[in-house]
Amino acid sequence: MARGPKKHLKRLNAPKAWMLDKLGGVYAPRPSTGPHKLRESLPLVIFLRNRLKYALTNSEVTKIVMQRLIKVDGKVRTDPNYPSGFMDVITIEKTGEFFRLIYDVKGRFTIHRITAEEAKYKLCKVKRVQTGPKGIPFLVTHDGRTIRYPDPIIKVNDTIQLEIANSKIMDSIKFDSGNLCMITGGRNLGRVGTVVNRERHPGSFDIVHIKDSQGHTFANRLNNVFIIGKGSKAYVSLPRGKGVKLSIAEERDKRLAAKTH
């Protein structure tokens, strides 16, 4: 009988979005417990070693993080397996670099560099709104934050713009048709579009219909839809491609056009 927490993660069982090669060993770094789920996070070791190539081995990553050089959402993190996730801001002050973890249209975490100005805030999806002891209202976000005394107009599935330095709500975006959203799960992971309408299915999953800037429409479950902007104006900068998924034929034409130039 297995007792206690699992401590290992086999490489073949690691999320495909980490893009680890099959033959690179038996195990993968198992993310520590933290604000994001295991399958929806990216450990710092993979970000620094496999993506940014700032280190060659796990022990080199440990040496980097133990110098307190890496901040996630404004807090120094010294755990190489710390699970950073969607919308987290990773700061490397020594090199003056700021990154926001965002999915590309293939559903992988991309290296998305941002300005120092944009690194001051992040977007959080509201997962729960309720009243705590002594009647204090609070909300819980997708990255496990609890914020007390929020604005009463903020409801579940809305998005809040959070100032990282002091965890204050700067602005909120309602979950409304016509607003810009990004898909955070399922086969449309990483796509960006505007909400067309929401089908309510009591007792089952609500379905949201979305249309991207190319006019393609697709549908997704409500809990995979993350509002990122009012109207067509995104509150965060988007990676290359702007979240538009091309069909296989369109991708081929684009590659051929790039070759001929």
UniProtKB/Swiss-Prot annotation:
Cysteines engaged in disulfide bonds, as pairs: none
Domain S4 RNA-binding stretches: 42-104
The UniProt record lists the keyword Repeat: no
GO cellular component labels: cytosolic small ribosomal subunit
GO terms for biological process, alphabetical: translation
Top-rank taxon: Eukaryota
GO molecular function terms attached to this record: rRNA binding; structural constituent of ribosome
Coiled coil start-end: none
Keyword Ribonucleoprotein part of the UniProt annotation: yes
Keyword list, A-Z: Ribonucleoprotein, Ribosomal protein, RNA-binding, rRNA-binding
Stated family: Belongs to the eukaryotic ribosomal protein eS4 family.
PANTHER family from the UniProt entry: 30S/40S RIBOSOMAL PROTEIN S4, SMALL RIBOSOMAL SUBUNIT PROTEIN ES4
Record protein name field: Small ribosomal subunit protein eS4
Source organism of this protein record: Carabus granulatus (Ground beetle)
